[in-house]
Amino acid sequence: FLADIKGDLSGMCRPGVDSEDMQKRIQKFGLAECGFNYHNYPAVFWDIYGDMGIPARTTISEMGPILLAKLMDLNDTQSDILTIVFKIADDRNLLLIDTKDLKAMLQYVSENSAELAAEYGNIAKQSVAAILRNVVALEAAGGEEFFGEPAMNLSDWFFSGDMSGRGSINILDCRQLVHDTTLYSTFLLWMLSELFETLPEVGDMEKPRMVFFFDEAHLLFKDISKALRGKIEQVVKLIRSKGVGVY
């Protein structure tokens, strides 16, 4: 998986073109003796906004209240109430697909807070209203495109990309996404968390099953909350035992 900040990684889907500079590099590193040749690689293009690739989407329910609270930078009280909102939806078998579903659920909880208090505890309408404002801000930042169906199925990435058995290189166009570092960071954390939860433990492998390369990685941590940064660091350290490398 490659996060493409500049838009220059997409060229690997086509064979390279020889040049004088390339010949110098081939000779310098002795690549001719290794059978070097120009060829393309199986590539799949993704884009959260759906402009330059397959829309990279997940649902509100799959993201969960913990990551969603970090994405919206909610305080402890608001985070607890968001968790309760998810619990109420779950108890009623209601799937939260997109931000419209979440806003409707928040409005329902606010309007019925008195009746719900006996089972779920006190739910302050002011806190629900604050969460609702954050959801609106999230929509404006690209959340309206990110949350929805069909959701990404990360297990599909482990199937070979062509008839020769080569795996696919998944490229995420980040030229627009990089301007919203919180959404960028949360998307990264969601992907790694999903893989961590679903993949079996494999210990130290000779070669990883999957690798993530993040171009301009310092931008991931620019202007994001300390809690979100800490969670990313934790998952990156733990996911190695699942056969996933992060670079």
Feature-to-residue mapping (PLM):
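P-loop NTPase motor domains
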Residues: 7-237, 241
